[in-house]
Swiss-Prot record:
Belongs to the bacterial ribosomal protein bL20 family. The keyword Cell membrane does not apply. One of its GO terms (molecular function) is rRNA binding. It comes from the Bacteria. Coiled coil: none annotated. One of its GO terms (biological process) is ribosomal large subunit assembly. One of its GO terms (cellular component) is ribosome. It comes from Streptococcus pneumoniae serotype 4 (strain ATCC BAA-334 / TIGR4). CDD domains: Ribosomal_L20 (cd07026). The keyword Ribonucleoprotein applies. This is Large ribosomal subunit protein bL20.
Length: 119
């Protein structure tokens, strides 16, 4: 039987990795071994940062809500507690959006929270 050298398969594998490494800096988009390492790292970074993104956005929303709440004479925790007592279910993303884009509506929510807190 003739020996099969697998050139087509190897080339296909290398081509796939180098295609994924397109746009990388320096040798990382040219040399197969370094490109392969960088692609593996890139997969790791992507996996990690998909989770990190959720934390980052939550932190951003809380910061924005806190700033707007303090402009209305409440702290973040007081506002959230007051909203819970007033049975107003609005998530942090929506609250942050109101704080940035619709100050009047946010003030109305803050006033409702203040009323339930007895302030």
């Amino acid at each position: 039987m003739a020996r099969v050298k697998g050139g087509v398969v190897s080339r296909k594998r290398r081509k796939r990795i180098l295609k994924l490494a397109k746009g990388y800096y320096g040798a990382k988009h040219i040399l197969f071994r370094t490109a392969k390492e960088q692609v593996m790292n890139s997969y790791y970074y992507a996996y990690r940062d998909r989770r990190q993104k959720k934390r980052d956005f939550r932190k951003l929303w809380i910061t924005r809500i806190n700033a707007a709440a303090r402009m209305n004479g409440l702290s973040y925790s007081q506002l959230m507690h007051g909203l819970k007592l007033a049975e107003i279910e609005v998530n942090r993303k929506m609250l942050a959006d109101l704080a940035v884009n619709d100050a009047v509506a946010f003030t109305a929510l803050a006033d409702a929270a203040k009323a339930k807190l007895g302030k």
